[in-house]
Amino acid sequence: MEKPKTISEIINLWKTDKKHYIKRSSYSAYALLIENHIKPSFGELIDIEEPEVQEFVLQKLANGLSQKTIKDILIVLKMILRFATKNKWLASKQFDIQFPTEREKHFVEVLSRANQKKVMNYVQEHFTFRNLGIFVCLSGGMRIGEICALSWEDIDIDNGVIHIRKTLQRIYTIEDDHRKTELILDTPKTKNSIREIPMSRDLIKLLKPIRKIMNPNFFVLTNDTKPTEPRTYRTYYKSLMQHLDLPNLKFHSLRHSFATRCIESKCDYKTVSVLLGHANISTTLNLYVHPNLEQKKKCIDQMFKSLK
């Protein structure tokens, strides 16, 4: 009779199998969750039951880990257990894990209209390639990895669009218990992230004189063959916000600000979702569509008018 495999042994076999057909960035993210959370809690076991997973979740919450991160960990754990079931190392598992109700609603942080105008005016008046990137993000809602990966060949002045087809990120790699980081240029994670973003008239006006003299293979943020990595660009963005005496919002707030301005301008939700490269429209609705009291009253009034 074959000796039962530990969860650690199953994880190693799963990683070897998974490595062949998922993106390196995804593999790296999975490996980090496994090494930091799954192996320390379950690695020495030969089976996992629901009460153990529920206790794991409650402990992680008590230690300050977000529900989103914990749910990401559970997704990886379930993939590993399905792999074990498929290979007949474990019986099939169906867990019903409970999370406490989140009392506070989390709203995205955005620049006010006045502060957004202040940033856009400044970066136009003080042109640098890094400032150009800030303007592009506020004009098109790009993620930081997408703007860092943007090259001049992606900017199509004739058709007035920016092609989003690459992302730049630094990933953690764990091999034989040795951890290191690596900067990788890759395609975006989902097919929806590969998209075209129309340029505003102001952006075309800014880019048209310089696009034709730029090397198409150079990165926009550096105008060189070597890119700026996201961590470095975040640091620059933070210093720019301090210089302008603006709130200390995360870089991602530029993307949130773009989306919020689109919604405020009555753009239809499906178009906003496509511009942002969201996997589905529900992501856009959950993040950006929060009717205020005045809008709710208007909705009720319109409903009763239709009954008369």
List each model region and its residues.
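Basic, Lys/Arg- and aromatic-enriched nucleic-acid-binding interface segment
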Residues: 71, 90-92, 96-144, 148-150, ...
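C-terminal catalytic core of tyrosine-transesterase DNA break-rejoin enzymes
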Residues: 86, 135, 139-146, 239-243, ...
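DNA/chromatin major-groove-contacting recognition/catalytic segments
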Residues: 119-122, 174-178, 286, 290-308
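Short functional hotspots where side chains directly engage DNA or cofactors
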Residues: 159-164, 220, 250, 261, ...
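Active-site/catalytic core of tyrosine-dependent DNA strand-transfer enzymes
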Residues: 198-247
